[in-house]
Swiss-Prot record:
Cited function: Ubiquitin-binding adapter that participates in inflammatory, antiviral and innate immune processes as well as selective autophagy regulation. Plays a key role in the negative regulation of NF-kappa-B and IRF3 signalings by acting as an adapter for the ubiquitin-editing enzyme A20/TNFAIP3 to bind and inactivate its substrates. Disrupts the interactions between the E3 ubiquitin ligase TRAF3 and TBK1/IKBKE to attenuate 'Lys63'-linked polyubiquitination of TBK1 and thereby IFN-beta production.
Native species: Rattus norvegicus (Rat)
Recorded superkingdom: Eukaryota
Region (Oligomerization): 320-420
Subcellular location: Cytoplasm; Mitochondrion; Preautophagosomal structure; Cytoplasmic vesicle, Autophagosome
Keyword tags: Apoptosis, Coiled coil, Cytoplasm, Cytoplasmic vesicle, Metal-binding, Mitochondrion, Phosphoprotein, Repeat, Zinc, Zinc-finger
Chain intervals annotated as zinc finger (UBZ1-type): 751-777, 778-804
Binding positions (Zn(2+) 1): C754, C757, H773, H777
Assembly, per entry: Homooligomer. Interacts with TNFAIP3. Interacts with STARD13. Interacts with MYO6. Interacts with TOM1; the interaction is indirect and is mediated by MYO6, which acts as a bridge between TOM1 and TAX1BP1. Interacts with MAVS; this interaction induces MAVS polyubiquitination. Interacts with TNIP1. Interacts with TRAF6; this interaction mediates deubiquitination of TRAF6 and inhibition of NF-kappa-B activation. Interacts with RIPK1; this interaction negatively regulates RIPK1 ubiquitination. Interacts with NBR1. Interacts with TBK1. Interacts with RB1CC1. Interacts with SQSTM1.
Protein name: Tax1-binding protein 1 homolog
Length: 813
């Protein structure tokens, strides 16, 4: 066996044209239709032709007969086209037992497609008859035709089909109901999901609002921590001041000791003066010493004065610290008010109030500590005043400063209270004043609107009167002109000169009076219209201002109402959302449990239906197998002897997987009626061994057709190649060595069993049919007849078949 070469079917020349519905055999003298498909890999030509070749051909000249391939109508390049050719019966070969195949040859002489092999055989009358047992449970055998048996089977299958259709309609109705239920549940689930998503979005909004409130609370806490840190810093400053005061007190004690020592020394000096009056020198020295001590005391007094100055600076520092504390208290009070205005949460306000109360207590404690320190300082000053007279003034000043500080603190507190009260009073007064102003403006606007309306009516009446007056004046003027014309006509005949002068004067006077009246009327109308326009503009402005004031009032009222109701609504919404989420979770859990139960019920129902179908199928199979009777022994013996004498089994290719355009090397199985009695869906047809063709195959070139295809040599030249033996194929020799295949002996009266599918057959079953069934499990190469096991790879089998065409490349040069 040669090595296989991987060649895709798309690139093979023999797969460009696919022959469809090729039978295993055809009648010799009957018309034959050839169906084939042109793939996108071939471009048709008007000189392309389809020929019948004997299997084993070597060149395109080895055709038996051919027909020109018609050019497809409306052909589009790159598309697939189905074509049909009809071969006449008198051009076809006779029943010679040879295998033939269709080949598509292009105008260049290239073979681009080949069909599966087939034979030309005449039908025998024995093959059309069948024997079967009588249905009346008698031992009689009934001989019928295949057509009758097939009609009975068709009637049975139609009845079964009707029953199955009824069952399918019932099942379809049930499935439609189940689908409706599932769709309804899915719609409910989608509705619930959308509702859940909406609630989740609302919850996210509430969480964002709470987060913003938390951020504000954190900011207030930071401010409070800053204030507490400042208070701690002030406490530390107070502690440092107390330490300094203690140090000063120790210094005062040391000064007191020094003063006592000085007094003792002075007493000693006085004693020495009394005792030693004579010793002037010593007295002078003693005076010098006393002067020195006095200077020291003066310096000490100066130092004490400096200390007093330091105390004053400390007092000023304390005043500044007290001012800072007061500013901190004011800031805390402002923060407290801001918190009361901004936050409506009761718990937060209580916490902040508690924190403010603690801070106020701490401030009060610091104030008390300051008072205690002031008292201690006053005590120290009193002691110092007792010891030194010079420091008495400082003590008085210190007390005065303390009084001033207390006064200032009291004044500041009173001022803060007064300012707060004044602010509230001013706000209330301003709001009341604005409300009263708005009321007055509304009243004034209403009065003004009434006045303007009255003025408009009055002016409208005046305009109507003026228009009437102008119309009447025009009528009078026309009448006067007519009468004047008559007077002028009468005076022409009497006194021409006088009449002429009168005519000249009177018309001029009448025209001047009329024009003056019209001008005054027009001026009056213009003034009235201007006044009306100005008043209308003023009215519109007042109306606009009134609307603006109303809008502002409504806006302020709405904002206050919204600020009051906002937090309550948020709290209520949050509680409702929590309750709804809990209810939704419970409802979802219940719905899921119910749907799981329904799904389990449907699954169990479908399993029961499938089991019932399988049981009905198995019962029908058993009934069909029981209905099949045993064939008569005489017919089986005759058929067995015929098969033993012939010894040749036809090779039938196995069923292959479906390709894109069909496999050109697989035959469409056309099972006869007898084989169809044993469930053709379960019976397959691979071969056991290849056909025992002769080693020396003679290729002849018949001259039936008068015309020959273009591009080929003269048929007379090809006749020289007749009777030339073709060397035997090594694959065929290999198969002949193993040509025994399966040995079927019909002499044993036992049930026949397929060695591959383990299907049981009756003892008298046709041996040829049984062998064909066993052969149907195997795969046979259509070129070399090599057999392959049933589980052999389909691609490997196709590669093997392709190697035969690759090894025998055709040359037309």
């Amino acid at each position: 066996m040669t090595s296989f070469q991987e060649v895709p079917l798309q690139t093979s020349n023999f797969a460009h044209v696919i022959f469809q519905n090729v039978a295993k055999s055809y009648l010799p003298n009957a018309h034959l239709e050839c169906h084939y498909t042109l793939t996108p890999y071939i471009h048709p030509h008007s000189k392309d032709w389809v020929g019948i070749f004997k299997v084993g051909w070597s060149t395109a000249r080895d055709y038996y007969t051919f027909l020109w391939s018609p050019m497809p109508e409306q052909y589009v390049e790159g598309s697939t086209v189905n074509c049909v050719l009809a071969f006449q019966g008198y051009y076809l070969p006779n029943d010679d037992g040879e295998f033939y195949q269709f080949c598509y040859v292009t105008h260049k002489g290239e073979i681009r497609g080949a069909s599966t092999p087939f034979q030309f055989r005449a039908a025998s009358p024995v093959e059309e008859l069948l024997t079967m047992e009588d249905e009346g449970n008698s031992d009689m055998l009934v001989v019928t035709t295949k057509a009758g048996l097939l009609e009975l089977k068709i009637e049975k299958t139609l009845k079964e089909k009707e029953e199955l259709l009824k069952l399918v309609s019932v099942l379809e109705k049930e499935t439609a109901q189940l689908r409706e239920q599932v769709g309804r549940m899915e719609r409910e689930l989608s509705h619930e999901k959308s509702r859940c998503e909406q609630l989740q979005a609302e919850q996210k909004g509430l969480l964002e609002v709470s987060q913003s409130l938390r951020v504000e609370n954190e900011e207030f806490m930071k401010r409070y921590s800053d204030a507490t840190s400042k208070a701690h810093q002030l406490e530390e400053d107070i502690v440092s001041v107390t330490h300094k005061a203690v140090e000063k007190e120790t210094e005062l004690d040391s000064l007191k000791d020094k003063l006592r020592k000085a007094q003792q020394e002075k007493e000693q000096l006085e004693c020495q003066l009394k005792t030693e009056k004579d010793e002037k020198e010593l007295y002078k020295v003693h005076l010098k010493n006393t002067e020195i001590e006095n200077t020291k005391l003066v310096s000490e007094i100066q130092t004490l004065k400096n200390v007093d100055g330091n105390k004053e600076s400390m007092i000023t520092h304390f005043k500044e610290e007290i001012g800072k504390l007061q500013s901190c208290l004011a800031d805390k009070e402002n923060l407290h008010r801001a918190l009361l205005l901004t936050t409506s949460n009761k718990e937060d306000t209580l916490l902040l109030k508690e924190q403010l109360r603690k801070a106020e207590e701490q401030v009060q404690a610091t104030r008390q500590e300051l008072i205690f320190l002031a008292k201690e300082l006053s005590d120290a000053v009193n002691v110092r005043d007792k010891t030194m007279a010079d420091l008495h003034t400082a003590r008085l000043e210190n007390e005065r400063v303390k009084k001033q500080l207390a006064d200032t603190l009291a004044e500041l507190q009173l001022h803060a209270v007064k300012t707060d009260q004044e602010k509230t009073d001013t706000l209330e007064h301003e709001l009341r004043r604005e409300v009263e102003d708005l009321k007055l403006r509304l009243q004034m606007a209403a009065d003004h609107y009434k006045e303007k309306f009255k003025e408009c009516q009055r002016l409208q009446k005046q305009i109507n009167k003026l228009s009437d007056q102008s119309a009447s004046s025009n009528g009078v003027f026309t009448k006067r002109m007519g009468s004047q014309q008559k007077v002028n006509d009468a005076s022409i005949n009497t006194d021409p000169a006088a009449s002429a002068s009168a005519v000249d004067v009177k018309p001029a006077a009448s025209c001047a009076a009329e024009t003056d009246f019209d001008m005054s009327a027009k001026d009056h109308v213009c003034e009235v219209t201007k006044e009306m326009a100005e008043k209308v503009e003023k009215y519109n402005k007042c109306k606009q201002l009134l609307q603006d004031e109303k809008a502002k009032c409504n806006k302020y009222a709405d904002e206050l109402a919204q600020m009051e109701l906002k937090w309550k609504e948020q709290v209520r919404i949050a509680e409702n959302v929590k309750l709804e989420l809990a209810e939704l979770e419970d409802s979802y859990s219940l719905q899921l449990a119910e749907k799981d139960k329904e799904i389990n019920c449907l699954a169990s129902f479908l399993e029961n239906l499938s089991r019932e179908k399988e049981l009905t199928k198995s019962l029908e199979d058993q009934k069909g197998r029981k209905m099949e009777g045993q064939s008569p022994q005489q017919v089986s013996r005759c058929l067995n002897t015929c098969s033993e004498q012939s010894g040749l089994l036809p090779t039938l290719p196995a069923a292959q997987p479906v390709l894109q355009y069909g496999n050109p090397y697989t035959a469409h199985e056309t099972r006869d009626g007898a084989d169809g009695a044993f469930y053709p869906d379960e019976i397959q047809r691979p071969p056991v061994r290849g056909p025992s063709w002769e080693d020396n195959v003679v290729c002849s070139q018949p001259a039936r057709n008068l015309s020959r295809p273009d591009g080929l040599e003269d048929p007379e030249d090809s006749r020289e190649d007749e009777n030339v033996p073709i060397p035997p194929d090594p694959a065929n020799q290999h198969l002949r060595g193993h040509g025994a295949g399966f040995c079927f002996d019909s002499s044993f009266d036992v049930h026949k069993k397929c060695p591959l599918c383990e299907l049981m057959f009756p003892p008298n079953y046709d041996q040829i049919k049984f062998e064909e069934h066993v052969e149907s499990h195997w795969k046979v190469c259509p070129m070399c007849s090599e057999q392959f096991p049933p589980d052999y790879d389909q691609q490997g089998f196709e590669r093997h078949v392709q190697t035969h065409f690759d090894q025998n490349v055709l040359n037309f040069d």
